[in-house]
């Protein structure tokens, strides 16, 4: 056999052995995933997606999504290279329980409280501010006069476990108003109940709106934040850095993204 043929044979065998060894190592050594458009490692972030909150989070995960809450998340991800969202739908109460248990990683639009801060991390800066109102149909002239006593004995719709309900019910109690409360899941269901005359009024924030509802009484306000489980300080570090970057580019972003979906 010629020397050149022997050399080719040796090279081929060596290459075959090397490829086989690489295949074995690839099977046992995990290879990190990276974002397609960067050298950043992919970080899957499970985000709570509120049902029945049109304007804030529209659509169903797996289909077309929109809303100012969705737009804010997309802007946030631009400044957090490698983030990949996985949306998990549910009611506010369900999603908060999942967040505290670490079953999801992120919830937007969460008001701060000392009780919540025992289980969650909040962004250093607020995502925005919301005002709380008692809404009624525009033709309720009795409520439009501004006298809280006109609410006496009415049936008022509210969401369970949310800040505007706590604040609104406390305001009503301070005014000496006795009402019947009826709970619904999501802001859209509240406005539907009002439109269908299931309730006389509703307690709601101004993050979503309805042409069939007018704010009659202002009952309070609060800032709201991004929140993550205490076990995910890495995510909160990313969020704080991203929010600072967004504010440097557009200090009015928090107001503008919300205004895009105002009725």
Where are each of the predicted segments found?
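Sec-dependent signal peptide cleavage junction
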Residues: 24-39
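Short, solvent-exposed loop/turn elements at domain surfaces
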Residues: 54-60, 116, 143, 166, ...
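Extended ligand-binding regions for polar small-molecule ligands
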Residues: 67-80, 138-163, 219-263
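Pocket-lining segment of extracytoplasmic ligand-binding domains
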Residues: 136-211
């Amino acid at each position: 056999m010629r020397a050149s043929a022997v050399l080719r044979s040796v090279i081929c065998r060596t290459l075959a052995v090397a490829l086989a060894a690489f295949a074995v190592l690839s099977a046992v050594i995990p290879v990190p995933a990276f974002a397609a458009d960067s050298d950043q490692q992919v970080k899957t972030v499970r985000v709570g997606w509120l049902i029945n909150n049109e304007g804030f989070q529209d659509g169903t995960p797996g289909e077309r999504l929109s809303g100012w809450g969705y737009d804010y998340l997309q802007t946030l991800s631009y400044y957090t290279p490698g983030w990949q969202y996985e949306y998990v739908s549910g009611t506010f109460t369900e999603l908060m329980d999942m967040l505290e248990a670490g079953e999801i990683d992120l919830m937007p639009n969460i008001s701060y409280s000392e009780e919540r801060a025992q289980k969650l991390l909040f962004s250093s800066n607020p995502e925005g501010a919301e005002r709380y109102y008692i809404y009624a149909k525009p033709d309720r002239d009795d409520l439009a006069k501004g006298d809280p006593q006109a609410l006496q004995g009415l049936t008022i719709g509210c969401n369970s476990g949310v800040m505007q309900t706590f604040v609104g019910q406390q305001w009503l109690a301070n005014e000496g108003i006795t009402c019947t409360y009826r709970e619904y899941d999501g802001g859209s269901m509240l406005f539907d109940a009002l439109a269908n005359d299931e309730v006389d009024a509703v307690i709601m924030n101004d993050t979503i709106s309805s042409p069939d509802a007018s704010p009659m009484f202002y009952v309070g306000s609060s800032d709201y934040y991004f929140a993550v489980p205490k076990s995910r300080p890495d995510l909160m570090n990313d969020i704080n850095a991203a929010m600072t970057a967004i504010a440097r580019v557009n200090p009015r972003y928090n107001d503008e993204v919300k205004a895009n979906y105002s009725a």
